[in-house]
Amino acid sequence: MNRIYACPVADVPEGEALRIDTSPVIALFNVGGEFYAINDRCSHGNASMSEGYLEDDATVECPLHAASFCLKTGKALCLPATDPLTTYPVHVEGSDIFIDLPEAQP
């Protein structure tokens, strides 16, 4: 895994999301003080998940077609999406957030 610096904790208030412009682009969410990172592109359509609707139960709804995903597992919870989103491990160290990304393939 390749650990990257994402942002300060203060940049992602509770109940909010932040787009992290990495490769791949990541959507970082704060749900009740727990941070979750997923691929920012909906698996059904070309929509930014960081612009989606965050629910208290750690799910996010795509802003384009209302597909819902579990932030913990990436699982698609309702149609029209059937494919999961990639999730990434998140680490909080002091006041900073880091995300583990897979190593780049040669």
Swiss-Prot record:
Which residues does the annotation say bind [2Fe-2S] cluster? C42, H44, C62, H65
| CC cofactor | [2Fe-2S] cluster
Q: List, in alphabetical order, the GO biological process terms annotated in this UniProt record.
A: 3-phenylpropionate catabolic process
Cofactor stoichiometry and binding remark: Binds 1 [2Fe-2S] cluster per subunit.
- At the top level, the lineage of the source is Bacteria
Pfam families recorded:
Rieske
CDD domains, per database record = Rieske_RO_ferredoxin
Cross-referenced Gene3D superfamilies, in alphabetical order? Answer: Rieske [2Fe-2S] iron-sulphur domain
One GO molecular function term of this record is:
3-phenylpropionate dioxygenase activity
Domain Rieske residues, every copy:
4-99
Entry's InterPro entries? Answer: HcaC, Rieske_2Fe-2S, Rieske_2Fe-2S_sf, Ring-hydroxylating_fd
Q: Which HAMAP family match?
A: HcaC (MF_01650)
For this protein, the record's NCBIfam families field holds: 3PPDioc_HcaC, PRK09965.1
State whether it acts alone or in a complex, and with which partners, per the record. Answer: This dioxygenase system consists of four proteins: the two subunits of the hydroxylase component (HcaE and HcaF), a ferredoxin (HcaC) and a ferredoxin reductase (HcaD).
Family note: Belongs to the bacterial ring-hydroxylating dioxygenase ferredoxin component family.
Q: What is this protein called?
A: 3-phenylpropionate/cinnamic acid dioxygenase ferredoxin subunit
Q: Which organism is it from?
A: Shigella boydii serotype 4 (strain Sb227)
Name of the gene encoding the protein in the UniProt record:
hcaC
